[in-house]
Amino acid sequence: MGGAQVLVLMTLLGTPPVTTGTPPVVVDPSVAVVGPPLGLGGGGRPPCRPINVTVAVEKDECPQCMAVTTTACGGYCRTREPVYRSPLGRPPQSSCTYGALRYERWALWGCPIGSDPRVLLPVALSCRCARCPIATSDCTVQGLGPAFCGAPGGFGIGE
């Protein structure tokens, strides 16, 4: 595998704020818009925003994982579904993705001498609704998995 792997272990920490929903609004006869304008959440769904997540960080050469709490992007974005087939194709769909981010450096413990224990993790500073950047993101409905620590030593907590 090589390199560091970051796996989502837990999703939201705490209770997300709930927004009030609005019924679908038709902007153009060919496109139905679901949710409130500007990509905000709707129907009781939280809008696209930075959320706290706990991830499992591991490297092949280090015997244990480390649970790290960081900030990622999560929430709902406005979607458009065509009412009829347009010769121009389907409208682009947006997803909640990073607006601005920085990287934090973490050091794994228990790594053998001579190996690099450092891992860089992205931290969301802001989020936006945009087309999913497939070159840098997992744009699937479900992640590529597995959502657990693969190191034989686990987290080393209480073991």
From Swiss-Prot:
BP GO terms, sorted: estradiol secretion; G protein-coupled receptor signaling pathway; response to light stimulus
InterPro entries in UniProt: Cystine-knot_cytokine, Glyco_hormone_CN, Gonadotropin_bsu, Gonadotropin_bsu_CS
Matches recorded under SUPFAM superfamilies: Cystine-knot cytokines
Key words, A-Z: Disulfide bond, Glycoprotein, Hormone, Secreted, Signal
Disulphide bridges: C48-C96, C62-C111, C65-C149, C73-C127, C77-C129, C132-C139
Signal peptide: 1-39
Keyword Mitochondrion recorded: no
Residues listed as glycosylation sites in the UniProt record: N52
Similarity annotation: Belongs to the glycoprotein hormones subunit beta family.
Protein name: Lutropin subunit beta
Organism: Meleagris gallopavo
